[in-house]
């Protein structure tokens, strides 16, 4: 369960634009991210996340390869009108992921991220067959719902199950965890 949660959190964070690639920041407030997966046996997921400018910037830095143990040999951004295309090759935990993402929409109201990726090596991923090369297609439809709700703090992610996880707290726990 914990591993599945980490994957969902990573996927949700992946919807954020990568700061190193100079993509627009998302509007602060409460965002809903609806994710569908092809090529992995995972059900659709819906997550709500409360953002402020600082949290969005931190999430973007983590996704763009600035996180510990992540090395990206390629990160390229191209723009054509309102469409952004990001191509990357990154390695972490012994896995190499080659991704092609197309982002359309507005980071103030609603956007869609369409990602195709190929993963080789590394530990097995939830919902994927063990070993070999895995191809997947993930679509993330994000929409701004309004201000964060009373009692929410920046970094709160409300999972489809209703459980709330704070990405900042999760990051601190992962940094404090003993290395294997």
Model-found features: residue ranges?
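N-terminal secretory signal peptides that target proteins for export/translocation
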Residues: 1-2
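Subset-of-secretome marker
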Residues: 21-180
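Hydrophobic h-region of N-terminal signal peptides that target proteins for export
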Residues: 5-6, 10-19
